[in-house]
Design a protein with these regions (language model features):
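Short alpha-helical DNA-recognition segment
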Residues: 16-35
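Short, charged recognition helix plus adjacent turn
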Residues: 65-79
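Alpha-helical residues within helix-turn-helix
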Residues: 9, 20-21, 50
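Residue-level detection of the helix-turn-helix DNA-binding "recognition helix"
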Residues: 12, 27, 38-40, 64-67
Length: 79
């Protein structure tokens, strides 16, 4: 899983937050969020830490984990 897919997943998990909503919270353009989600750019360390605080996750979760698969596995365990 890529950083971009994880970011998109977290954004939707947080009440279907739009790219525009996230851009406003992060003080960047919507185009920047789009580039992050498409994996054509990555945030600098300060912005990455800010994303982690916003979504209550670790840098490791944000950049390395497959958050979608982890979420699905957790959901399947609860069923």
């Amino acid at each position: 899983m890529s950083f971009g897919k994880n970011l998109q997943f977290l954004r939707h998990l947080k009440g279907n937050m739009t790219q525009e909503d996230l851009a406003e919270k992060m003080n960047v353009s919507r185009q920047t969020i789009s580039k992050w989600e498409l994996d054509t750019a990555q945030p600098d360390m300060d912005k990455a830490i800010e994303l982690c605080r916003l979504f209550n996750c670790s840098l490791d979760n944000l950049f390395r984990d497959d958050m979608v698969a982890c979420s699905e596995a957790y959901t399947n365990l609860r069923v």
